[in-house]
């Protein structure tokens, strides 16, 4: 690799989520919270308990962060965990790399059931005077889609603020929402089975429009007809470039596009590798889409200006398995993706903004020449989420864990958690 960069840990959950017993995790978290609350002049709201905290069985499992979000102002994080937990973290003010601080939940609440997918409003901040902008959407099985208001007290997420109709009249059951994303602060879009996509207004229970024309076009397909993801819209410039269209991926190895003006969707690509698209990252200039697949070691690069054709590929130095490894892309830092051995690989911005090509337009085939590596202190763990702070190019939040689908990794010795890191060139 061209160069190696050291990322320094500023704050982390330390050993809170280590091991494979949820009761032990919750007890450690309560202890850390009590120590923090007793030494702080600020009245920290009491952490809520899971309704399963008194159960003796079925709690021997990993507690991995499945979704991680920055607030718009970069002052807090929201984490969705496998223990059905919804946690808000305030970012510590100290930036001393030699004195790592403890990342303790500011609020902790629990969904009564497992969370399949989530989406956070782009206007979220713990410091919002108007809490209506702090909307979190969560989906589950056999329940309608629900939204919650994230607040600064122990009542945060105690009950839904809105319930949205996802009932499938044909089978008299609720559609399972596998993916969703806010288009803006007042609209969001959802994806479910049979390649069904629905557009909602946050203030209305019924969808503005639902359509599955894509499903009928592909009715002969034997692969899973599930909308697996939508284009990552954390990039503000991307929102300006795509105000009315939304790209999406499926577990059937396809990519398509929705045009909310015409209430239509169409298939653009059918990939020949991997086991389903799970993330679509746009370049900052809006010209390219970076497509990540399960069970693959390749990132496809799609040029939206050339009939949405794959014009290049980036090779990953390991094979992504069933557990998703979510990356981040920015104008300053390019494309960053965690590895299964505790580092972060980085394709520089000047290459990413030109479709992964060299300055002379040629395709760089040698992996060693096209990527650098960022070293962390989490050697041996999988860094399954990398999120850049929206207010600081050198700050990152990550989730690290063992392989959740490997039985050998479900022991008391495994390490999981969330960490706040700062990049610095050696």
From Swiss-Prot:
It is found in: Nucleus. It comes from the Eukaryota. The keyword Nucleus applies. The keyword GTP-binding does not apply. InterPro entries: SWT21/TCAB1_mRNA_Telomere, WD40/YVTN_repeat-like_dom_sf, WD40_repeat_dom_sf. GO terms for cellular component: nucleus. Coiled coil: none annotated. Keywords: mRNA processing, mRNA splicing, Nucleus. GO terms for biological process: mRNA processing; RNA splicing. Belongs to the SWT21 family. PANTHER family: TELOMERASE CAJAL BODY PROTEIN 1. Involved in mRNA splicing. Helps to stabilize the U1 snRNP-5' splice site interaction. Associates with snRNPs. This is Protein SWT21. It comes from Vanderwaltozyma polyspora (strain ATCC 22028 / DSM 70294 / BCRC 21397 / CBS 2163 / NBRC 10782 / NRRL Y-8283 / UCD 57-17) (Kluyveromyces polysporus). The lineage of its organism: Eukaryota, Fungi, Dikarya, Ascomycota, Saccharomycotina. The gene is SWT21.
């Amino acid at each position: 690799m061209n160069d190696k960069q050291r990322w320094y840990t500023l704050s982390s959950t330390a050993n809170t989520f280590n091991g494979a017993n949820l009761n032990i995790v919750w007890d450690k978290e309560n202890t850390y919270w009590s120590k923090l609350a007793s030494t702080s002049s600020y009245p920290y709201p009491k952490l809520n308990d899971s309704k399963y905290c008194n159960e003796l069985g079925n709690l021997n499992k990993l507690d991995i962060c499945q979704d991680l979000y920055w607030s718009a102002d970069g002052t807090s994080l929201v984490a969705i965990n496998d223990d059905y937990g919804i946690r808000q973290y305030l970012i510590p003010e100290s930036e001393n790399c030699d004195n790592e601080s403890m990342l303790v939940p500011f609020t902790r609440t629990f969904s009564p059931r497992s969370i399949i997918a989530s989406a956070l409003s782009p206007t979220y901040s713990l410091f919002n005077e108007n809490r209506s902008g702090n909307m979190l959407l969560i989906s589950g099985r056999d329940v309608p889609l629900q939204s919650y208001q994230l607040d600064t007290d122990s009542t945060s997420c105690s009950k839904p603020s809105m319930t949205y109709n996802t009932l499938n009249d044909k089978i008299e059951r609720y559609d399972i929402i596998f993916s969703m994303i806010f288009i803006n602060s007042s609209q969001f879009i959802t994806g479910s089975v049979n390649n069904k996509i629905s557009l909602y207004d946050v203030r209305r229970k019924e969808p503005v429009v639902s359509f599955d024309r894509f499903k009928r076009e592909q009715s002969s397909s034997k692969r899973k007809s599930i909308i697996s993801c939508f284009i990552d819209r954390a990039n503000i410039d991307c929102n300006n470039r795509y105000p009315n269209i939304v790209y999406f991926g499926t577990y059937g190895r396809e990519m398509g596009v929705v045009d909310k003006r015409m209430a239509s969707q169409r298939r653009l690509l059918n990939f020949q590798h991997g086991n389903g698209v799970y993330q679509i990252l746009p370049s900052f200039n809006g010209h390219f889409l970076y497509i990540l697949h399960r069970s693959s070691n390749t990132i496809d690069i799609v040029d939206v200006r050339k009939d949405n054709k794959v014009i290049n590929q980036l090779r990953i130095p390991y094979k992504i398995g069933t557990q998703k490894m979510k990356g981040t892309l920015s104008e300053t830092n390019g494309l960053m993706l965690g590895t299964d051995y505790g580092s972060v690989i980085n394709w520089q911005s000047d290459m990413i903004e030109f479709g992964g090509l060299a300055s002379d337009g040629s395709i760089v085939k040698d992996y060693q020449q096209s990527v650098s590596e960022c070293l962390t202190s989490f050697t041996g763990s999988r860094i399954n989420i990398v999120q850049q702070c929206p207010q600081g190019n050198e700050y990152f939040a990550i989730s690290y864990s063992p392989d959740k689908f490997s039985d050998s990794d479900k022991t008391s010795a495994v390490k999981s958690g969330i960490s706040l890191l700062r990049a610095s060139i050696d």
